Every structure is written in structure tokens, then in C-alpha cells.
Amino acid sequence: MNWRRIVWLLALVTLPTLAEETPLQLVLRGAQHDQLYQLSSSGVTKVSALPDSLTTPLGSLWKLYVYAWLEDTHQPEQPYQCRGNSPEEVYCCQAGESITRDTALVRSCGLYFAPQRLHIGADVWGQYWQQRQAPAWLASLTTLKPETSVTVKSLLDSLATLPAQNKAQEVLLDVVLDEAKIGVASMLGSRVRVKTWSWFADDKQEIRQGGFAGWLTDGTPLWVTGSGTSKTVLTRYATVLNRVLPVPTQVASGQCVEVELFARYPLKKITAEKSTTAVNPGVLNGRYRVTFTNGNHITFVSHGETTLLSEKGKLKLQSHLDREEYVARVLDREAKSTPPEAAKAMTVAIRTFLQQNANREGDCLTIPDSSATQRVSASPATTGARTMTAWTQDLIYAGDPVHYHGSRATEGTLSWRQATAQAGQGERYDQILAFAYPDNSLSRWGAPRSTCQLLPKAKAWLAKKMPQWRRILQAETGYNEPDVFAVCRLVSGFPYTDRQQKRLFIRNFFTLQDRLDLTHEYLHLAFDGYPTGLDENYIETLTRQLLMD
């Protein structure tokens, strides 16, 4: 029996049955009172007010508070060097490598945040948190440890006022984007910015409990716990959390975008909507009618974000927008807010195009409203567009240049028409993006990087073999040759297939074993959606038949 078969059987053995399922607990801070939700894998089972007595172990959350202190007090970076001396380094880095603050928070590297290593004095720590009226457990370094039990209410209180939380929220988006948490970003988008935690359940060393705590994108504190590790909680309950967690519609990025409206069309005059008198240059508030020199006209609304300028006798309309409002307005102009999955994919493409193509002027990005770049609605974004944009706030698709078109579909260009069709077939936004941009990866605005280290020689070898194998494979029930896919280098662990992103992860491409791994993972993708695609014996037998034929 090969290792793939062993891993598959172990996974089946360890999966909990519905009868054994312990409800997931989710707490959201509300305007009037905090709400406690109990969730099963199929939905909400109970909602009640949060009892003051509900407690939680801190688990790994203590690291978030050290991170906040380091950021807020502007402590210099002190990288942790991995030397292979501690088993805890598995959460940090490989021997010979080092890890910095942001990455340590995402990976939950406790060795980095150890107060003794960072020379954090108990008096300095206590004074800092006492000045901020923090809970007693937070003001004492001796109680800042995983086993410390605190009330969930006090935890939410501390998160609501946590210093440097904007920076922490930005960095913690990488937790959701972790490629090992398959399906989480697909279901939750960028709505949660959380630090994961795991600990022992009720002091029973053999039973784990885990979850996460942090914020929604609008700053609402939340806390979650369930049976298993934080990773299993996230992956198992991502679908139901998607249905329960709200989507804020008024979210700002703090990044400004300056847009010259109607950049390619000379303006003749601007009037109030029900007037024929041209308005003077200045900030615009209200409904206006712009007339172009070609005789066409359009009505738009400004709430002070758009200014009429006159430069060398030529009129110019310039809007000063938050980045996420800009994305929503482009969605309104270039596409629609429905179907949702296509719209979500479009917002990521729009945001990525902006990052790749905008110029900078001071603190703002600058980009013209033009069919040569991106067309922008002159009026405020619709609620639907803002909702779709908020769902993917800060997400980009890092890697190769990104383009999109209304109807034309080519590699590197997302077709809106095709995206709507894919959404109609049940594909999620990340699958739509993966089809259009197979070599790119979901990433965040502040740290654009592709998680797929491409193996072009492996992909070229597979592309050459596919026509040769077609005669054999087309005779197999369930075979569906994938149109696009990527072959990526595996950083650690066993080779695997990310079916949603259509990515094959293998260690390298030098040996016969590498070719066996690549073929094996390709077959998992080619038989995706059919029972044989999950049959390790079938896939392994077919792999050897293809390579030994």
C-alpha cells in the first residue's frame, strides 16, 4: 500500500461523524450586545446573547498582543533565526532561514514573540496596557500564556481597542490566503482578518480545540471555537461561516485614487441637472449634466468627491476616491454586480489592474477614466457593487499582467461574458480567476506575491504527453481533460492537487518519481467530479499504465 493510500485512509478514519459533531461557537460584537451563534456544518442551530461567564483559553492569541505592542511602540525588527534546535521552529522557518514580525504573526511563530527574546520588561508591559485600560490578564506578562482562561467578553473588549489593529488586520489576511487552507478564501473572501489559535480542550491533552479571533473588515471583533485545530475549524466550517458572517458595505481602504473622468472626451460645459447655466470651477455637490464637445451629454452625481477644474482654458473633472470605492465604480461601469461570483472575480481583476498600471502622485494613485485603462462610473457606486467589492477588499491576483474584456477570452484576459457563464455553472470567483490567469495567485494589496512557484519544464512535459495519453484516457469513464492548469513547486509535505485553483503541486521535476507524482496529480484533476478521481488505487494504477506504456 503506497503512502497516498495510507494518507487517504487515515483521513477517512479521522473525519468526525455528524453524531459526534460539536457545535462551532461564533461570537460577534453587536451595537447593543454580543451575539453567540452555535453552528453545525449545515447551518445555525442556536442564537443567543453572549453570557458573561463564557471563557476561552488564549492559545496562540497572546502573540497578537505582543505584535500590537511591537508595532505601536515602533520597536525595530528583530528577526528570529531558525537553527534547528527547537521543535517549535516548525511554525517559524527552515533551519538556516529567519522570520520577521509579520510572517511570524501569520505562521504563529511563538519563538519570535517570546517576551524574553524581545527584552520586554514586565513593568514596561504592565504600564503600557494599564494606560489603555486593558483587562488585568493582558497587563501581566505572567498570565500572557496559552493556558490562561479569559472571558470571551474581555477578549472582544481588548480586540475592539487593540493598538495597531489596522496593521494587524492587513497582515492577518494572509491567514485566509494560506494555500494549505484549501477553500477558505474561496468561501470567505477577505471578510475576516483573524489570528488562529489551538489548545487542549478542558485540560484533556488528547483532545484539541481551536478557532480564531480578530475582526471583520469593518472592525467588528469576533471569536470562534470548535473541536480540532484552527485549520480544521476554518476548512470544515468555511461554507456555513460564509452564510452567517455579514458583508460590510461601507469599508474604506485608506488608499486614495485620483481619477480624471471622461479623460478621452473633451468637455464643453458642466451645468446643474435642471439648469442651463455653466457652473464655475470648484468642488461639486449635487446632480450635474456634463456636455461634451461632440454634442453628447451625461448626468452624474457628486457628493464633494469630484472637482471641476479649468486648465489652460480646458475643463477637467477630477474625482478623489477611496480605492475600494474606485473598484466598485469600475464594476458598475465595466460589468455588473450580478451574478455574484463573476462580480467578485471582476473586482479582484479591477483591483489588480489598478495596482499594476496606476501612477503615483504623492500619497494617491492616479489613473484616467478611459477604455485604454478602466472606465469609471462618475456617480457613487451602487450598493450591489459596494457589497461585491467589500467581499474581496484588498484582494489581488498577483503574478502576470491582468486584463479583462467584455466578451473576448484569452489566457491572461478575463471575459465578463465567460465569467457569468462560469458562475451560472456553479464556479466560485477564485475558480473563474484561475481559469483566466492560471499562473497568478490570490494575494493581498500590501504584499503582492504569487504562491505558485511555476515549474515550466514540468508543464511543458505534461502538455506534450497529454495528446499521447488521450486515446487511453478517453476510454475511461469520467475523464475530462482540463483546459488550463498550472504546475507549482511544493514547498513542503506530499504532492497534491488544488482542484479549485487547478494547480498541481509537486516537489520538483528531475526524477522518475517526480514524473509519477505529476501524472498522478494530473489524473486527480482530469477525473475531478467523478468517483474515480478520489480512488487512490485507480489513479495510481492508471498513472503507472501511462508512464510504463
Curated annotation (Swiss-Prot):
Residues 1-19 form the signal peptide. InterPro entries: Beta-lactam/transpept-like, DUF2300_secreted, SpoIID/LytB_N. SUPFAM superfamilies: beta-lactamase/transpeptidase-like. Keywords: Signal. Transmembrane segments: none annotated. It comes from the Bacteria. The keyword S-adenosyl-L-methionine does not apply. This is Uncharacterized protein YfaQ. It comes from Escherichia coli (strain K12). The gene is yfaQ.
